[in-house]
Structures are given as C-alpha cells and as structure tokens.
C-alpha cells in the first residue's frame, strides 16, 4: 500500500483507517527548519494539520511568517515573543492566534521547556520562512544554545 503524501516531510497522514495518534510518542519532525528549535509529532488531515510541539527552554524561533494561519495552545511552560508587532506572554492554558503571513517570533522562557499544540490550515505545510530570508538557525536566549551547552560540558570535566 502506498503512503499518502503530506505537505510536511515526516508527518503522518490521517484517514484511510488512521483515526487516533499517540502524538507525544511519534517521530519528531522539525517544525521550523533554519529558524526555530520547534519539533514534534505532526498529523495532517485533508485540510488541517496538528502538531504536538516541543521547544527546549531558552530557545525558539527567529522572526518568521507562513502562508497559513495558525493557533498555538500552550500545554506546559511559557512562550514569549510577538505576533504582528504585538507582544505576547503566554503561560500554560493560553491560546495564541497567528494570522496568515503575520511576522512572529515565539521563544520558550528560560525556566522550563514548552509543549504546545499547533493547528494550521493546509494551504501550506508546518514550516515557514524567516523574515530576513536566511536559514541561519534558531533564536537562543543568552546562556542557551549549542555554544552554551558545550561550555557547560567542558566546565564539568
């Protein structure tokens, strides 16, 4: 049986007998290649996609946009950033709306990792484009990121 094509590489296609998913246990998909640390299980239906997304503490996305509108529901932790120029501080239990093509950035606060549920229409996949046109990597708060992790490992030796 041929696998149904998805707009997001690595996503699972719902339907044809597939109606429930253990999203927290699914293969992790990069949900912001080149501009974000977001990753998690992604399921696509006929017109919507759903993601169970993880952002490690002190990390997140640089300013970016995508052609599809999006809702993010914060399950654990706190996201901070901006949507269309408006500041956002979203602790667990908060729903964030991101209009199509709206520049936005969301970063996990340094105190704990964030888990959020992402819902997007399928006019586009889960990955957008950085506003500055580069794919140089995600945003890291001071003291976080690959360099900080390697310095911490070296200090323990």
Task: Label each region the model flagged.
Residues 86-100:
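Short acidic-glycine-tyrosine-enriched beta hairpin
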Residues 60-62, 77-82:
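Short beta-strand segments in beta-sandwich/barrel cores
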Residues 68-79:
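Glycine- and acidic-residue-biased ligand/ion/polar-headgroup-sensing regions
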Residues 100-126:
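Ligand-binding loop in jelly-roll beta-barrel domains
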Residues 40-42, 61-66, 107-109:
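Short histidine-centered beta-strand/loop micro-motifs
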Residues 34-36, 51-65:
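Conserved short histidine dyad/triad with adjacent acidic residue
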Residues 1-47, 129-157:
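A short, N-terminal "cap"/entry segment at the start of jelly-roll beta-barrel domains
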């Amino acid at each position: 049986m041929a696998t149904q094509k998805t707009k997001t590489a690595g996503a699972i296609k719902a339907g044809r007998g597939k109606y429930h998913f253990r999203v927290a246990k699914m293969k992790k998909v990069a949900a912001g290649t080149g501009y974000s640390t977001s990753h998690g299980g992604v399921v696509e239906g006929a017109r919507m996609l759903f993601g169970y997304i993880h952002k490690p503490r002190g990390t997140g996305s640089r300013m970016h946009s995508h052609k599809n509108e999006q809702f993010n529901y914060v399950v654990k932790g706190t996201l901070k950033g901006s949507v269309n120029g408006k500041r956002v501080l979203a602790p667990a239990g908060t729903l964030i709306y991101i209009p199509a093509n709206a520049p936005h950035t969301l970063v996990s606060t340094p105190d704990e990792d964030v888990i959020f549920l992402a819902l997007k229409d399928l006019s586009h996949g889960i990955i957008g484009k950085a506003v500055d046109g580069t794919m140089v990597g995600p945003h890291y708060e001071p003291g976080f990121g690959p360099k900080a992790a390697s310095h911490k490992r070296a200090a323990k030796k």
